[in-house]
């Protein structure tokens, strides 16, 4: 919305300075690229007659401007018989505003007998049509008079309108037509391959005898929006039929920006004739509507229809393959709160790649003359109404996706088929839920989907949750799972139809036929606080006499659970044991209720419970089960039962008992990455401790400063079912050094690290701050050199976990760490190696490291809490030999090579307490195992650049059966 109002503000500002131009002037630029103020010319300077155009091209112009034209022609600014093209208009754009004609086409029009083509393409600047009008007063007394013919196209009236490949906003704002096409009226309209947004804002048309069709766009054959890069915005347009768009066929295909239909109105306010009813608050088509393969979000929100279809009225609708799609707060004064479907072709709504959500769409049922609702049929929630006698609708969701109805749907005729997840690729969830219904609005009308149609579930999940009720006459399950959650009701009913044309009227009844072969109980939903167990119900038969309705049990209903498998699942149909707190025992927990007309009418005693106890991750334990049976007394005469819930005599409750036995985490939740962050800290700090500051003992006092860059790469191999990791670090350091016979140095460094889990996208990004102090001592008059080093490091870390196995989810966490380290090295004096100039000496050292993490909780999918139970402690004893070689060129150089065996003297492996918040399961995470023996190496080279300046390069690391570590440092020292 911010983008929308930005464009509106900019457009209005550009137009503001031209609005007082005398109305007798039609403004059209000449080819010379003068400043915009030079584009205002008197009418005599125009090139050609703009009201008698046949084949006219306006190409490569700096600006096209038409304002305040009031003419008697069809097209206040341009009258076209064949073709008018706007091409390659430069950055100043096209502006047409406040033009007026009593005929059709507020800016561009055509004689009645002609159907010209209008083409706007390849423009760089904005294209804006604002406040244009085609209008003539209409009189009811003589509707056939020529003066009362249709006035259409508030901005453009033509045969074909093509808008393509434009670089900037194309906008139609506050245009008005008396009959149809508040902004555009055409035989064909195509908006394709544009690089910027399309805006229709506050356009309107009103109804005459022919009907006010298309508040923004009216098309008599086909309308298309295809392969555009930016947003398509239809805001606050109004008309009788199709508040924004009216067309026989309409397609929105392959667009990459958001598609928004907001606060459009389909109304009826001038003529009471019924030529075109006020249907489709946003879109009305008479043949087919395709909204497919659009990459971004789609919104139909706050649209209103005077009759049917608060957002969409269509005989056939295909809504498939799109980005996240939302139908919210739409209102139809009759039925079809969001969508109204009338045709006999098969419609399809599928959440293939992202969710589709229907929420708080209202069917107002305004049946009284004053527009009010009947007390017997008040306003209620309604997502979709299918009022066709044949055909069908396919409702589905792709893998890990959801098609969610927070509003009931209505299918009125038995000849219609409803297929849930018909295609094999549709393994997601079709959900009926009452989760968003406020407590004050809880009623059967807001929760129940009741239909005589034939329903079939083939794949995936059909979920009924949070007090929603699905009442069916004919339901068959050939595959998938019927998932029942908190307060869900799946019921059967006897459908009856009355033929009023017969004398006396005849009533035909159809007995219920429901077959289930796999039921899933949504364990997290049923066990949450305040939840109710789901219900399978054979609804009684109602009989109304006068003002009294009584109920009798339906013994003829066929509702079969014979051989049906019972599973325990979560809301996505997966194992529930990681998402449900099963740490405590459950005793005789009510999980499923059955209300039936005769004993074992549903054949529940023949259900298959073999899938209840299956191997799984998460909480471990054992389920046992049994049925509790109750039978109502039969003393009450059936004719006196007025409560439908008391009509059935037989009731069963499934009771489950759970005995817990520990917790086993799923591999996708274990996350060794967090513990491996400690290993990353330790490895980096260890190599820092080995990194010499270039200290040396001199025969005079000195002090100096140092600075340089560093980098490190670590490859940790997978071992013992741990994935391993690789780490990349870069940073810089600065410090000071001082001394004489003993030296002391202090160094500060900052580094940036990315630690990636091997064979996965998971990673931790870190920023570390380190302080390191070093002292070099000469003992026993130079017989032994001792180096003491201490280090402290503080790190800020951001973890990123990705769940890619059939999901597209992620979680993030922020935490910090502290690392402490110390080292001591003992070197004997360097001595010549044989007769060579190479000096050698043995050395011995000890390195101790300690690192721990702060506790933190992730956000995102599957959030977890991490707490360091035991920090990582690692003590090394490197022992080896080093050799040194010097040359005395004009830039003296010294080379040193070290080779050492580096065993682990003591190690405390890190232990990270991890808890999955959804199910409160806890386990201890460990890092990737590291070898206890390694070969360490170091190569350093020092060059004296100037008397007081030296350059030192160091490469060191170690190799083991588990780890390959490489560290590189370059440093310049200035000594005084």
Swiss-Prot record:
SUPFAM superfamilies: Autotransporter. Belongs to the PMP outer membrane protein family. Keywords: Cell outer membrane, Cell wall, Membrane, Secreted, Signal, Transmembrane, Transmembrane beta strand. SMART domains: Autotransporter (SM00869). It is a peripheral membrane protein. It holds the Pfam family ChlamPMP_M. It comes from Chlamydia muridarum (strain MoPn / Nigg). This is Probable outer membrane protein PmpE. InterPro entries: Autotransporte_beta, Autotransporte_beta_dom_sf, Polymorphic_membr_middle, POMP_repeat. Gene3D superfamilies: Autotransporter beta-domain. GO terms for cellular component: cell outer membrane; extracellular region.
